[in-house]
A protein has these predicted regions:
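Predominantly soluble domains enriched in secretory-pathway, periplasmic, or organellar proteins
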Residues: 5, 20-225
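Bacterial N-terminal signal peptides that target proteins for export
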Residues: 1-7
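C-terminal motif of bacterial Sec signal peptides marking the signal peptidase cleavage site
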Residues: 15-18
Length: 225
């Protein structure tokens, strides 16, 4: 009887300690920049560097230049956009023809992609690969493309030729949609790419200068032009 009275309180204490530890592990922050908003700042055109700002969810903290603060190097000229995978951020520097890959929660650098890009614009993950819109040489309306990024070794493993001015990019299942704003000119198309075959399967005509897209709950594609 005495043994039973001692055993049950100890069992309760052990269970309470175990649950408490589990809760602490679940809520442990993944990094300094896990809970908040990331803002890409282009920086001055043709010189200097772009930056990234972190704003906490409660708006009480604003940290500017977090990439340089963490890695002691500049991002590159004209930070065009930031795209994400589950654990990584892909920071696209347009004029520098570079994508810096970082841990999205700590902002520690993982890799830089510099080969196979030409005026990169926007990144998205689809079907286990990365896709980046590229304007190419803006004086040449025939060299625009979407670069295919190997997410294991962070290299460009292929390209898909597209029409003038690929800009915003959106993914759904095995399909990628590319809005063609027209670079420095004008366009009115959306390219549809199959990410299994990495082939352009269709081109849709929309309003002039499409600049953003959204899928609704029914899977319909909406294009703002």
């Amino acid at each position: 009887m005495k043994i039973r009275n001692v055993f049950f309180p100890l069992l309760i204490i052990g269970l309470s300690w175990s649950c408490s530890n589990d809760d602490e592990e679940i809520h442990e922050p993944m990094g300094d920049y896990a809970n908040g908003i990331l803002v890409s700042n282009e920086g001055p055109f043709s010189n200097g560097t772009g930056t990234v700002t972190f704003i906490s969810e409660d708006l009480s903290v604003v940290n500017n230049g977090i990439y340089k603060m963490t890695n002691d190097e500049d991002l590159g000229n004209v930070v065009q956009s930031i795209g994400f995978t589950e654990n990584e951020a892909f920071i696209v520097a347009n004029v520098s023809n570079k994508i810096n890959v970082v841990n999205r929660y700590t902002f520690e650098k993982i890799a830089s992609i510099t080969d196979g890009l030409n005026n990169p614009r926007y990144f998205i993950e689809a079907n286990g690969k990365g896709y980046v819109t590229n304007w190419g040489d803006t004086a040449d309306e025939t060299d625009d493309f979407v670069a295919i990024i190997n997410l294991q070794n962070y290299t460009v493993e292929g390209t898909i030729s597209v029409i003038l001015g690929p800009e915003a990019i959106l993914a759904k299942d095995n399909t990628v949609y590319v809005a063609h704003q027209g670079a420095w000119g004008q366009n009115n198309k959306v390219s549809v790419i199959n990410t299994t075959s990495n082939e352009l399967i269709k081109t849709l005509t929309v309003g002039d200068v499409p600049n953003s897209m959204q899928l609704d709950a029914s899977g319909n594609l909406w294009v703002l032009a």
